[in-house]
Amino acid sequence: MNPRLAACQALAAVLAGRASLSGALPPQLDKVAPRDRGLTQELAFGAARWQPRLQALAARLLQKPFKAADTDIHALLLIGLYQLLYTRIPPHAAIGETVGCADKLKKGWAKGVLNAVLRRAQREGETLLAEVDRDPSARLGHPRWLLKALKQAWPEQLDALCAANNAHPPMTLRVNRRHGERDAYLAELAEAGIKARACDYSRDGIQLAAPRDVRELPGFAEGRVSVQDEAAQLAAEQLESAPGQRVLDACCAPGGKTCHLLETQPELAEVVAVDLEESRLVRVRENLQRLGLQASLVAADARATGEWWDGKPFQRILLDAPCSATGVIRRHPDIKLARKPEDIAALAHLQGELLDALWPTLEVGGVLLYATCSVMPAENSDSIAAFLARTPGARELDLPGPWGMKQPHGRQLLPQVEGHDGFYYAKLIKISAR
């Protein structure tokens, strides 16, 4: 299949609200020749990443918008514009190949429209973009509501935050310290000709200079290393679990933090890992098996403790709460398209329900680490403030360290262009059963 057509099919599913990019793209990649998969992914992710800007430009170029039934043609136009603006593909090839996809979609009528619009974009692109970019939403590549929320939360960091959201994310590894230390693995990478550096904050983290197929990584299949962003790697260290403890990892999929907990503390009594659906636990099982680790996996709503908790208290709980994922937009750019303003309050409510439900399962003297990959205060510091206000037996513990920014409650990491994702942590101790 033509890579532009495959990217178009995936993006159209996202634009229509039928799927996420991570769900829609893999089936399309299977239809593309291996040599074209990188281009397919670049076009789909790139068009989603810059959709607010590309959409604003398309609105200038089109006499009238496409009908809802022609979302695929709309997606094709965005992919064509992305090629002209953001890639080194020769314009004649970008336009010709993109226009030709209309026949494959059995919409030959669209060829003339696509050809005219893309050729005008090629001729007048700079002038039109100067007009389009007067709108900060287009210039910074974020929907208006999201840009407003980010500006309200992070006025001084707004431009850098948007730049990080629009950047290609780095590939970061987590060395399994059961098999050796980071420095030794860095030496192996150097010997294999793979450029990399030690992460700044995670003692197990390595950031690659350029993404690699995991099959090229020494010892990946044997469980010596995993792929995990540096910000997510901080969870295991901050939880400070000890030998003999029983640990709960709530909302555990895809299992990176579950595995890291077991790698850093091999003598835990048990790790119970809960996620909502059995299908989400498939990846967790695969990761545990590859790494040679064991955990008790439970498919259940973590809030419904009566259905899955055996009554034995946990000494440590990691609550990696469902969130807006606004700290990982660069990895999932379709978040810009899928998220709605009302989602933030709904997610904050869900997070509060999870905190309230899981707190009784924690032993007095035990610690709960609350984590999200969001940069929205309503889901982070505000959620913790509300929980502390209604929970007399909860006290906040300090999170010392050089990473992130101290907030009224917890610490916030914002995504960095050449570094970690956006993440939030807060640490609570149970001082009484109230």
From Swiss-Prot:
InterPro entries: MeTrfase_RsmB-F_NOP2_cat, MeTrfase_RsmB-F_NOP2_dom, NusB-like_sf, NusB_RsmB_TIM44, RCMT, rRNA_ssu_MeTfrase_B, RsmB-like_ferredoxin, RsmB/NOL1/NOP2-like_CS. It comes from Pseudomonas aeruginosa (strain ATCC 15692 / DSM 22644 / CIP 104116 / JCM 14847 / LMG 12228 / 1C / PRS 101 / PAO1). This is Ribosomal RNA small subunit methyltransferase B. One of its GO terms (biological process) is rRNA base methylation. The gene is rsmB. Its EC number is 2.1.1.176. Its main location: cytoplasm. The active site is at C373 (nucleophile). GO terms for cellular component: cytosol. Gene3D superfamilies: Helix hairpin bin, NusB-like, Sun protein, domain 3, Vaccinia Virus protein VP39. It catalyses: cytidine(967) in 16S rRNA + S-adenosyl-L-methionine = 5-methylcytidine(967) in 16S rRNA + S-adenosyl-L-homocysteine + H(+). It is found in: Cytoplasm. PROSITE patterns: NOL1_NOP2_SUN, SAM_MT_RSMB_NOP. Signal peptide: none annotated.
